[in-house]
Protein backbone atom coordinates (compact mmCIF):
# COMPACT_ATOMS: atom_id res chain seq x y z
CA UNK A 1 0.00 0.00 0.00
CA UNK A 2 2.86 2.37 0.79
CA UNK A 3 4.42 1.85 -2.63
CA UNK A 4 1.02 2.25 -4.32
CA UNK A 5 0.48 5.58 -2.58
CA UNK A 6 3.96 6.91 -3.32
CA UNK A 7 3.96 5.87 -6.98
CA UNK A 8 0.35 7.06 -7.26
CA UNK A 9 1.38 10.47 -5.93
CA UNK A 10 4.25 10.61 -8.41
CA UNK A 11 1.80 9.66 -11.17
CA UNK A 12 -0.61 12.40 -10.07
CA UNK A 13 2.19 14.98 -9.94
CA UNK A 14 3.41 13.91 -13.38
CA UNK A 15 -0.02 14.10 -15.01
CA UNK A 16 -1.78 16.91 -13.14
CA UNK A 17 0.76 18.71 -10.97
CA UNK A 18 3.04 20.34 -13.50
CA UNK A 19 5.09 17.28 -14.40
CA UNK A 20 6.03 16.19 -17.89
CA UNK A 21 2.64 14.56 -18.47
CA UNK A 22 4.24 11.58 -20.21
CA UNK A 23 2.57 9.01 -17.96
CA UNK A 24 5.87 7.54 -16.82
CA UNK A 25 4.36 6.17 -13.59
CA UNK A 26 1.08 4.86 -15.00
CA UNK A 27 2.09 1.23 -15.49
CA UNK A 28 4.06 0.90 -12.21
CA UNK A 29 1.10 2.43 -10.36
CA UNK A 30 -1.33 0.10 -12.09
CA UNK A 31 0.73 -3.00 -11.22
CA UNK A 32 1.17 -1.93 -7.60
CA UNK A 33 -2.53 -1.17 -7.26
CA UNK A 34 -3.53 -4.58 -8.63
CA UNK A 35 -1.18 -6.34 -6.22
CA UNK A 36 -2.29 -4.16 -3.28
CA UNK A 37 -5.98 -4.80 -3.99
CA UNK A 38 -5.33 -8.54 -4.34
CA UNK A 39 -3.38 -8.76 -1.09
CA UNK A 40 -5.95 -6.61 0.71
CA UNK A 41 -8.75 -8.88 -0.51
CA UNK A 42 -6.87 -12.04 0.50
CA UNK A 43 -6.13 -10.61 3.95
CA UNK A 44 -9.77 -9.58 4.39
CA UNK A 45 -11.02 -13.04 3.44
CA UNK A 46 -8.52 -14.61 5.83
CA UNK A 47 -9.71 -12.31 8.64
CA UNK A 48 -13.39 -13.02 7.96
CA UNK A 49 -12.80 -16.78 8.01
CA UNK A 50 -10.82 -16.71 11.26
CA UNK A 51 -12.71 -18.22 14.20
CA UNK A 52 -13.95 -16.01 17.00
CA UNK A 53 -11.75 -17.04 19.95
CA UNK A 54 -14.13 -15.98 22.72
CA UNK A 55 -16.98 -13.59 23.37
CA UNK A 56 -16.01 -10.33 24.98
CA UNK A 57 -17.96 -7.19 25.81
CA UNK A 58 -17.76 -4.27 23.40
CA UNK A 59 -15.38 -1.70 24.82
CA UNK A 60 -12.85 0.73 23.43
CA UNK A 61 -9.60 -1.18 23.12
CA UNK A 62 -7.06 -1.98 20.41
CA UNK A 63 -9.32 -4.69 19.00
CA UNK A 64 -12.17 -2.23 18.47
CA UNK A 65 -9.78 0.38 17.07
CA UNK A 66 -8.44 -2.23 14.64
CA UNK A 67 -11.95 -3.21 13.52
CA UNK A 68 -13.09 0.38 12.99
CA UNK A 69 -9.91 1.27 11.08
CA UNK A 70 -10.14 -1.93 9.01
CA UNK A 71 -13.73 -1.08 8.07
CA UNK A 72 -12.58 2.41 7.07
CA UNK A 73 -9.73 0.94 5.03
CA UNK A 74 -12.10 -1.49 3.32
CA UNK A 75 -14.51 1.31 2.41
CA UNK A 76 -11.58 3.37 1.17
CA UNK A 77 -10.16 0.51 -0.87
CA UNK A 78 -13.51 -0.13 -2.56
CA UNK A 79 -13.86 3.58 -3.27
CA UNK A 80 -10.32 3.69 -4.66
CA UNK A 81 -10.99 0.86 -7.09
CA UNK A 82 -14.14 2.56 -8.39
CA UNK A 83 -12.60 6.05 -8.53
CA UNK A 84 -9.41 4.76 -10.13
CA UNK A 85 -11.36 2.95 -12.82
CA UNK A 86 -13.58 5.97 -13.53
CA UNK A 87 -10.62 8.37 -13.61
CA UNK A 88 -8.58 6.12 -15.89
CA UNK A 89 -11.48 5.55 -18.29
CA UNK A 90 -12.19 9.30 -18.38
CA UNK A 91 -8.54 9.97 -19.22
CA UNK A 92 -8.48 7.18 -21.83
CA UNK A 93 -11.54 8.61 -23.58
CA UNK A 94 -9.87 11.99 -23.97
CA UNK A 95 -12.61 13.70 -21.98
CA UNK A 96 -10.79 16.23 -19.84
CA UNK A 97 -13.97 17.50 -18.19
CA UNK A 98 -13.52 17.16 -14.44
CA UNK A 99 -10.53 14.85 -14.86
CA UNK A 100 -8.22 16.74 -12.51
CA UNK A 101 -10.96 16.92 -9.87
CA UNK A 102 -11.56 13.16 -10.11
CA UNK A 103 -7.82 12.57 -9.83
CA UNK A 104 -7.62 14.84 -6.76
CA UNK A 105 -10.44 12.95 -5.05
CA UNK A 106 -8.79 9.63 -5.93
CA UNK A 107 -5.51 10.93 -4.47
CA UNK A 108 -7.14 12.14 -1.23
CA UNK A 109 -9.10 8.91 -0.74
CA UNK A 110 -5.90 6.92 -1.36
CA UNK A 111 -3.97 8.69 1.38
CA UNK A 112 -6.96 8.47 3.74
CA UNK A 113 -7.19 4.73 3.09
CA UNK A 114 -3.46 4.45 3.77
CA UNK A 115 -4.05 6.22 7.09
CA UNK A 116 -6.81 3.79 8.05
CA UNK A 117 -4.58 0.83 7.11
CA UNK A 118 -1.73 2.26 9.18
CA UNK A 119 -4.00 2.69 12.20
CA UNK A 120 -5.45 -0.83 11.79
CA UNK A 121 -2.00 -2.37 11.47
CA UNK A 122 -0.60 -0.45 14.43
CA UNK A 123 -3.58 -1.38 16.62
CA UNK A 124 -3.19 -5.03 15.61
CA UNK A 125 0.50 -5.02 16.55
CA UNK A 126 0.04 -3.34 19.90
Model regions and ranges:
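Hydrophobic alpha-helical membrane segments
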Residues: 1-126
